[in-house]
Swiss-Prot record:
Species name: Loxodonta africana (African elephant)
EC numbers for this chain: 7.1.1.2
Protein name, as recorded: NADH-ubiquinone oxidoreductase chain 2
Any one biological process term the GO annotation gives: mitochondrial electron transport, NADH to ubiquinone
Gene symbol of the encoding locus: MT-ND2
GO cellular component, one term: mitochondrial inner membrane
Catalysed conversion reaction: a ubiquinone + NADH + 5 H(+)(in) = a ubiquinol + NAD(+) + 4 H(+)(out)
Coiled coil: none
Topology within the bilayer: Multi-pass membrane protein
Alphabetized InterPro entries for the sequence: Complex_I_Subunit_2 (IPR050175), NADH_DH_su2_C (IPR010933), NADH_UbQ_OxRdtase_chain2 (IPR003917), ND/Mrp_TM (IPR001750)
Taxonomic classification: Eukaryota, Metazoa, Chordata, Craniata, Vertebrata
Entry keyword Ribonucleoprotein: no
């Protein structure tokens, strides 16, 4: 892609997200979401092949349907209340429609159908943007709507997302699809805690983005996209394999890694609000995710295929630009748990 065109696309993507996040007016927030959607399409089609074209078409059709539903909800709210304020959507029909539209944009169940297919059809870098950056704008709107949303609809979507995210990833062999189902599951955790403590939703989103960025950067550096290529990682890059193993354990929420912190705080918050059955159900369903994370760890780290190469280290390196981004992300992804008391005091 032309560097000038790419810089323009990325700038517009950044501007669309920031417009939505800083807006308190529904019309400008909707415009930011549309800028976000339209600039994401050429990013998904960075490589022109039938699969990426199909993925971009699916993404456009789903997001356009969600945008149309959101605009219909805003029009209904305007007819009844006469205002465009995000924090004052008083009509229950409009509120539920807007909530479902934003859930579709987030890719939470039962509106998740497009996420695995689109993620699998594109390269790793567009998939990384899709599963991380594209969550910011819709979640910022849900954060502002948290006081008057339909909690039953949020709980239903959250529990379904955790269940489908764990269940759908069990029989997958493609890493992008596994990470897509992992994203659906994490969206469920964020949605359920949203009515109780929106700050914990932001904490969970921050740690999820750090973990997902780390995994995608490792997979991009090692050119790994499937379980079969994952089995060769230990022979080629042992250090990267160990980093991938610890990051996957953190993504599954295993102590004493960073991913355990948001789950711990969310379960504590739910039990503090006299909700016992829901956190217990969430913790049990999260074991499904932990199973396929352990499956990835087994294939990458605990299985070494027979090899005729006696050299344990790579002797010929490609010319890559060294960066501090990945080590920093890996450190943050695995070592933030001791900060839990300080973070819980800031809530």
């Amino acid at each position: 892609m032309n560097p000038l065109a790419l810089s323009l696309i990325l700038t517009t993507l950044l501007a669309g997200t920031l417009i939505t996040m800083m807006s308190s007016h529904w019309l400008t927030a909707w415009m930011g979401l549309e800028m976000n959607m339209l600039t994401m399409i050429p990013i998904l089609m960075k490589t022109t092949n039938p699969r990426s074209t199909e993925a971009a078409t699916k993404y456009f059709m789903t997001q356009a349907m969600a945008s149309m539903m959101l605009m219909m909800a805003l029009t209904i709210n305007l007819m009844y209340s006469g205002q465009w304020s995000i924090t004052k959507m008083t009509n229950p029909v409009a509120s539920n429609m807007a909530l479902m539209a934003l859930m579709t944009k987030l890719g939470s169940a039962p509106f998740h159908f497009w996420v695995p297919e689109v993620t699998q059809g594109v390269e790793l870098t567009p998939g990384m943007i899709l599963l991380t950056w594209q969550k910011l704008a819709p979640l910022s709107l849900l954060y502002q709507m948290a006081t008057y949303t339909n909690t039953n609809l949020i709980y239903l979507s959250g529990l379904l997302s955790i269940l489908i995210g764990g269940w759908g990833g069990l029989n997958q062999t493609q890493l992008r699809k596994i990470l897509a189902y992992s994203s659906i599951s994490h969206m469920g955790w964020m949605l359920i805690i949203l009515p109780f403590n929106p700050t914990l939703t932001l904490l969970n989103l921050t740690i999820y983005i750090m973990l997902t960025l780390s995994i995608f950067m490792i997979l991009t550096n090692t050119f790994t996209t499937s379980m079969s290529s994952l089995t060769l990682m230990w022979n080629k890059t042992p250090a990267m394999t160990i980093m991938l193993m610890t990051t996957l354990l953190s993504l599954g929420g295993l102590p004493p890694l960073s991913g355990f912190m948001p789950k711990w705080l969310m379960i504590h918050e739910l039990t503090k609000n006299n909700s016992i059955i829901m956190p217990l159900t969430m913790a049990i369903m999260a074991l499904l995710n932990m199973y396929f994370y352990m499956r990835l760890i087994y294939y990458s780290s605990l299985t070494i295929l027979p090899s005729t190469n006696n050299m344990k280290m790579t002797w010929r390196f490609t010319n890559t630009k060294h960066t501090m981004t990945l080590p920093t992300l890996i450190t943050l992804s695995n070592m933030l748990l001791p900060l839990t008391p300080m973070i819980s005091m800031l809530e």
